[in-house]
Design a protein with these regions (language model features):
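Phosphate/diphosphate ligand-binding glycine-rich loop within oxidoreductases
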Residues: 2-111
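Anionic-ligand binding region
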Residues: 145-169
Length: 169
């Protein structure tokens, strides 16, 4: 892999552990910077002008989804992204929140008493707190495993009353 430049966009992000995780994961081989601004368009332009990939956090996950040229299947199901990568075909969006939550739910379910297989075998109910990009990813992951999902948020948002399938459009 060629040497690239990577970063994180969102606001606020000064508290983020992403730089330390990225540095540890790639043993410091690639630069990773915080692009902190409340203006999504400014952050996105900085990505286009000087970065190969960026992690995306609140409040930009849904805005970044709209900007992507290519969407992973997870992103299409959720309507949000937490990772943008430049490719020869354009900017591709991924959602590792979805993949991580799905793996975790399967792992936790397998450890539950009277469970001898993955989470798709029995009815399980989960509560998702939050309806932003990460909450949507968690709900989609749980629903993909056949779990019954209840969503809760501190403020009422119109999309809370819509079935998750509507977000796939």
């Amino acid at each position: 892999m060629r040497h690239g430049k990577f970063g994180l966009i969102g606001h606020p992000i000064g508290h983020s552990l992403s730089p330390a995780l990225f540095k540890a994961g790639y043993e410091g081989r690639y630069p990773y910077e915080l692009i902190e601004t409340a203006d999504f368009e400014e952050a996105y332009m900085r990505f286009l002008e000087g970065y190969d990939g960026i992690n995306v956090t609140a409040p930009f996950k849904e805005l970044a989804y709209v900007k992507a040229d290519i969407l992973s299947e997870e992103c299409k199901a959720i309507g949000a992204t937490n990772l943008l990568v430049k490719t020869p075909e354009g900017v591709k969006a991924y959602n590792s929140d979805y993949l991580g939550v799905k793996m975790w739910l399967n792992e936790v379910y397998a450890e539950m008493p009277e469970s001898n297989s993955d989470a798709t075998e029995k009815e399980v109910s989960v509560l998702i707190v939050g309806t932003g990009g990460a909450g949507k990813a968690a709900a989609a992951a749980a629903e993909s495993l056949g779990m019954r999902v209840t969503r809760m948020n501190r403020t009422v948002r119109d999309e809370m009353t819509r079935p998750l399938e509507d977000f796939r459009e």
